[in-house]
């Protein structure tokens, strides 16, 4: 059977490196992007707190700015720590 890809239905920036995310399977968690900001040139723009604050749900994942920066929902699902943990 083909497993359904998880999608992000809600995303809210918490601070300058973390986003609260909700998935369509009911899971909610916090995605810490600090390692991405530090290690990945593609995410360098997110080091600007005002740009990071544009985080929102879109296209089934978390997007920033005009949508040209995103994070794969399956990666977010794997890395998000449960809310309240």
Which functions belong to the PLM regions below?
Residues 1-85:
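Motif-centric detector for short Cys/His coordination patterns
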């Amino acid at each position: 059977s083909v497993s359904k890809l998880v999608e992000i239905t809600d995303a809210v920036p918490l601070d300058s490196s973390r986003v609260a995310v909700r998935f369509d399977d009911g899971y909610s968690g916090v995605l810490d992007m600090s390692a991405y900001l530090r290690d990945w040139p593609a995410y360098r723009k997110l080091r600007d707190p005002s740009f990071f604050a544009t985080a929102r749900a879109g296209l089934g994942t978390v997007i920033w700015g005009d949508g040209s920066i995103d994070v794969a929902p399956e990666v977010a699902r794997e890395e998000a720590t449960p809310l309240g943990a």
